[in-house]
UniProtKB/Swiss-Prot annotation:
Probable ubiquitin-protein ligase which is mainly involved pre-mRNA splicing and DNA repair. It is an enzyme of class 2 (transferase). Keywords: Coiled coil, DNA damage, DNA repair, Immunity, Innate immunity, mRNA processing, mRNA splicing, Nucleus, Plant defense, Repeat, Spliceosome, Transferase, Ubl conjugation pathway, WD repeat. Disulfide bonds: none annotated. This is Pre-mRNA-processing factor 19. InterPro entries: Pre-mRNA_splic_Prp19_cc (IPR013915), Prp19 (IPR038959), RING-Ubox_PRP19 (IPR055340), Ubox_domain (IPR003613), WD40/YVTN_repeat-like_dom_sf (IPR015943), WD40_repeat_dom_sf (IPR036322), WD40_rpt (IPR001680), Znf_RING/FYVE/PHD (IPR013083). SUPFAM superfamilies: RING/U-box, WD40 repeat-like. The gene is PRP19. Residues 107-141 form a coiled coil. GO terms for biological process: DNA repair; innate immune response; mRNA splicing, via spliceosome; protein K63-linked ubiquitination; protein ubiquitination. It catalyses: S-ubiquitinyl-[E2 ubiquitin-conjugating enzyme]-L-cysteine + [acceptor protein]-L-lysine = [E2 ubiquitin-conjugating enzyme]-L-cysteine + N(6)-ubiquitinyl-[acceptor protein]-L-lysine. Pathway: Protein modification; protein ubiquitination.
Length: 527
């Protein structure tokens, strides 16, 4: 009398009328409630088809093995043998699993190495392809038949115009629509933007002091000439007299990579967060576009040689698809970033002054340039026409910065900083932080438009006010390089720190002591 489900002697046996099978009542009831079928034959079955089996009420006898001591010892011996066999089987399974895991880990390591190699080969192939794409048009133009002019000379009519200048494709209507749409969107967003509550307060900035110093450039050619901060990754890029650009991770205090390729000092550089690109301009008359890889390295994908003199400034448009370079050859170039092509090169026939600084307006339709002749020029990007000129500086305009409020422009020169109201096209304030022999080398608004940083013989931070109110000095940070020449000043996110570059090789971070615990172990260096 064995239950057809459990294989045990049932305590409350029942029989199916249809199949005649014996079941434990509680088991078959539960199965019928869930499925409505016989658990063995799968026929339709209800509780009405189940008949209870009447048995005698007797005491269940004890098993013979448990009725004596020898029987109990035999049972224990059998149980022990079963446990030993099970343990042996488990040890064998564990050994097999360890072997399989070791094999899988070796396979994973080999796969990772192969993937890394393939990625490296892919990046190299991309760089070669981009270089080939730039070389093919030039080679095709060189191989194309040329027209013979009356004096017997040959000219490339598709590249050079009658005036001897290269013919550029220009900014087409589609690009103009894109620039206009970007301007409309950013302008509307800027008007709604409020000062973030996380912005560093005046009291906090008054307590700023040097929290770290990092030797990034060579000792035999010291000097940081340009600087930029990645808007989302807290990476600081510096360009030096040693011809190198260094990418520095501020939170970890480590150098991510050093970009080499220019033959002279790097005068300007900018991040292009879109597609992890990076642009550098140099005194060697070239501009390089660098492509970042997943491993953190940067490869040069374009080398642009459209200028005939030192490239002094690089500024990236808000769309992150275009950028402008300004040079001492008295021209500025508008580039398409993906193709690395110069869409237009703008120069003025009158005057021989070169450009020393340039910056896009935050909304993107206005470009500001500073010249060696102390003139600030405002350009309409869509038409490439000079729409305004600001005069009054003494010496070359070394730096400029548009405020995020959209209507303040700060420019720096030998005589200090001049503040311009773009709504009325006039100078409403002049800040002269240093004596007449000390030029102002850097000027920078923070992203909120609440503070203005000035770099010269030291670093000074001013509170931004309106046209009528005084712009108060908040903090003076000494130049700890010993050179007496601060060349670059940049605000970190929410003005939580200030990055300063000087004519030594060290990048210095000023902030509130204790706010950046990750930088506490960094050793200051005054070499």
């Amino acid at each position: 009398m064995i239950c057809a489900i459990s294989g045990e002697v049932p305590d409350e046996p029942v029989v199916s009328k249809k199949s005649g099978l014996l079941f434990e009542r509680r088991l078959v009831e539960r199965y019928i409630e869930d499925h409505g079928k016989c658990p063995v034959t799968k026929e339709e079955l209800t509780m009405d088809d189940i008949v209870a089996v009447k048995t005698n009420k007797v005491v269940k006898p004890r098993q013979l093995q448990a009725a004596s001591i020898p029987g109990l010892l035999g049972m224990f011996q059998n149980e022990w043998d079963a446990i030993m066999l099970s343990s042996f089987a488990l040890e064998q399974q564990l050994h097999t699993a360890r072997q399989e895991l070791s094999h899988a880990l070796y396979q994973h390591d080999a796969a990772c190495r192969v993937i890394a190699r393939l990625k490296k080969e892919r990046d190299e192939a991309r760089a070669l392809l981009a270089q080939a794409e730039r070389q093919i048009p030039a080679s095709m133009a060189g191989a194309a038949p040329t027209a013979v002019v009356s004096n017997g000379k040959r000219a490339f009519e598709d590249e050079v115009g009658p005036d001897g200048k290269k013919i550029r494709p220009g900014i087409n209507p589609v690009m103009i629509d894109e620039l206009t749409e970007c301007n409309t969107m950013l302008s509307a967003h800027r008007k709604k933007r409020q000062v973030p509550p996380t912005l560093a307060s005046i009291d906090a900035i008054e307590r700023y002091t040097q929290i770290s110093s990092h030797p990034l450039h060579k000792t035999n050619k010291p000097g940081i000439l340009s600087m930029d901060i990645h808007p989302s990754k807290d990476i600081i890029a510096t360009g030096g007299i040693d011809t190198n650009a260094v990418l520095f991770d501020r939170p970890s205090g480590q150098i991510l990579c050093t970009l080499t390729g220019h033959s002279k000092k790097i005068t300007s550089l900018k991040f292009v967060p879109r597609d992890e690109l990076f642009v550098t301009g140099s005194a060697d008359k070239t501009v390089k576009i660098w492509q970042g890889s997943e491993e953190g390295n940067y490869n040069c994908i374009h080398t642009l040689k459209d200028h005939t003199a030192e490239v002094e400034a690089v500024t990236v448009h808000a769309t992150q698809k275009y950028f402008v370079t300004a040079s001492k050859d008295n021209t500025w170039c508008f580039y398409d970033i993906p193709s690395g092509s110069c869409l237009t090169q703008v120069g003025e026939s009158s005057g021989q002054e070169g450009y020393t600084s340039a910056s896009f307006h935050p909304d993107g339709l206005i470009l500001g340039t500073g010249t060696t002749e102390a003139v600030v020029k405002i350009w309409d990007v869509k038409t490439q026409s000079n729409v305004a000129k600001f005069e009054g500086h003494v010496g070359p305009v070394t730096a400029m910065s548009f405020s995020e409020n959209g209507y303040f422009l700060a420019t720096a020169a030998l005589d200090g900083v001049k503040l311009w109201d773009l709504r009325k096209l006039r100078n409403f304030r002049t800040i002269s932080p240093y004596d007449s022999d000390t030029p102002t080398n850097s000027v920078e608004f923070d992203f909120s438009g609440s503070y203005l940083a000035v770099g010269g013989s030291d670093t000074r931070v001013y509170q931004v006010a309106n046209v009528k109110l005084e712009w108060n000095l908040v903090k003076t940070l000494p130049d700890l390089s010993g050179t007496g020449k601060v060349t670059n000043v940049k605000f970190g996110t929410d003005a939580k720190y200030i990055a300063v570059g000087s004519m030594d090789r060290n990048l210095r971070i000023f902030g509130h002591p204790g706010e950046d615990d990750q930088m506490d172990d960094a050793k200051p260096s005054e070499e």
